[in-house]
């Protein structure tokens, strides 16, 4: 059944299959030396630098300089940047410049890391790519043009669009489903032109090469030796290199006695691969994980081997050459043959065998996934706040150099954690701790920066005390909205007193509510309704009622009341729905069943539709003993049977207030358990008149608690409805575009192979209604029954597989996690209009900076006095920042500066502002919001000053788009992209039009004060 599922995808491959190799003469093998250097995974970055990574660059640079024919490709930038900044000598730096100029050293991808494709958000992919590209362009004046995405666990359809927007000419991937790869090899369909975005189509297509079954590693088995082949430097040793230079498993040296045997092995492998591709050009990767730490011994053995093969090329039918990835793709492009087109479908999920579905990592280390996204959101807010502080003119005494350092530290950390063994949760515990430490340190620095900016603005008023804790005068909260839309939402603060007055900048009372904390009995949750224009602040004074000034008539925050329901056993009968309790706002009525303490149904006012909705927690019990069968681990999800309920009893309480009503459900493993393992806290907001609360009203906010789990359990939240969904769900690729996910029955492992990543949103629907889930971290998601959607929240695993144990890659995660989902229910038209903006509102919630009042509340500028930055509802401010790059936007001028060798004398440019705009909607998705949108950047950015110049750039900022000419590849579709990445546009003007799904990048220059 698995093979049959792929027949529709294989049909165009079979039709295009040529009768044979399309060229006479020998096969031409491009030997591409490389080292796969994971930024983390088993060892920390510093451990890897000490053991092998620094030696890779030191020895490769030395060896490339010794032979004109030698080549090497470098991929992730983190190790190279550490080597460049802390290890490389002046001579080695000069050699690198020379090798790059000669094309013998080539940077591919060029990002800080090789990011994961399944569980990363597009914004963070762009960030880490921009980080690496900015360094490479600033340092060398080069711009990577090819990708080498060989190790992410599955391929997203967002990736071809991302790399096309970055200016790449070709894309290389590897890990796709095993049975699909086998079929594509058979059909010689591993190369195609990928149009990943249905809206952008050929405008942002890219030629794509899928590696064959050998992937990125050199075939290590050679028939004449019991050692691995072609790895003459052996295997890296930790914690540091051996003093005698002898490593484990070093391949037998090439000698006159065995050179024919080596040549036969290499040629046989090249010919095997040639049969899987349409041209006689064969890419032969030479390398693997942690290779080339001794490039001398590598090239010393490969050089005579390649010379031997070439001297017998006519007889062997193969010629070989050292090559970069660019050399290979240029040779392919020169052939100018016709390639098939692949549409916007992705290559997820990824399986390597029938019982090895790599769908567990969609959820592994949920806490790290959540932290990574929170760090990204904080960085996003800090970038725009600092930019707005600097423009139109700095208003205080903040040191811009220090400020930029705080942002750069978090940029590095957020980029680092996008690695395909980081945010995936597939790293060892000590490496997880490294990522957490880097993120936490970076977040602390940016919070200090944001607090400093606030204090700079408040300095004349001096309302905050330096001490911590609740002072007698109360608290002061500054709330910053990083989105370029006006946002109405609830912010939640923790206070130590049960009665409070909340006032705004002008001293006016603010709608607020006080209630018992969900976490700590001794404190209280204070909920404040706030409306904040784009890139603006609100300031609130919070004082205990006992400390209010005498004689004032300020209304206090309303106090919520709690209605408790006794513990109910899990019912095994269908007699439910007889005693329902309604909880309502102006958009929804949630009906709760008193007999079960579970949700029963939701009525949506606008469509006047009621949908049965029940939620519960289940667990998959999985095997950890390899002797007993397939196992689950950090990567794999391998359930032996269906999930079972993880609770026997549930308590419920309703906390009802004038502003917010919360439904709290606590799930216990048995009737007498003292502590609950799972919880759902659902919130409906009652938006007062006079506030635009469309988004706030039309969502049910849910926070869950899961854990600690028992060993070898995988916890899911299952939402069951009466929607006739046909077991079809939709989940997103990287928060950018949606993929239809029909349930597929396989011979084996159907549960796991029908799990998909949800990075930001998912939904299911029937002809009348749609239920949308929005998330603030990645999860695995599936529909295991009609009208059902289940979200995997947490995993705790241990197994005795030697490989996992040897690398400490078991997942004995005893943490308690608190993921958040927002639910939207309504018609297709309603949810289409709200889904994208609501997802952004969840990802980029207002940032609250909290301090103690030292005296009377200050009078500060309210939103009416601030100049907001506002975009239309279908256009998202993807970034507004001051990158601080030290290069000229003029490529010729920058190249001249590099040749003069004065890069170190150039100061960080604090005047250039990076702006990126993202159209959120697909073509035809909404009759209004899917239209192209025209904006005047002078008007949009007037709060920052007078715009004097607008430069449109490539996605990562390194190309002037007027100078960017990507390769065009011949296709059989009848449509052909021109040689530019976008339609012709008027150059440099402030009035721009952004089309559906476009992401456009600009450098903005303001009039200096």
UniProtKB/Swiss-Prot annotation:
Name used for this protein in its record: Epididymis-specific alpha-mannosidase
Gene3D superfamilies linked to this entry: 2.60.40.1360, Glycoside hydrolase 38, N terminal domain (3.20.110.10), Glycoside hydrolase family 38, central domain (1.20.1270.50), Golgi alpha-mannosidase II (2.60.40.1180), Golgi alpha-mannosidase II, domain 4 (2.70.98.30)
PANTHER family reported for this sequence: ALPHA-MANNOSIDASE, EPIDIDYMIS-SPECIFIC ALPHA-MANNOSIDASE
Cellular component annotations (GO), alphabetically ordered: extracellular region; lysosome
Key words, A-Z: Glycoprotein, Glycosidase, Hydrolase, Metal-binding, Secreted, Signal, Zinc
Gene Ontology terms for molecular function: alpha-mannosidase activity; carbohydrate binding; metal ion binding
Enzyme class: hydrolase
Biological processes, Gene Ontology terms: mannose metabolic process
Cofactor note: Binds 1 zinc ion per subunit.
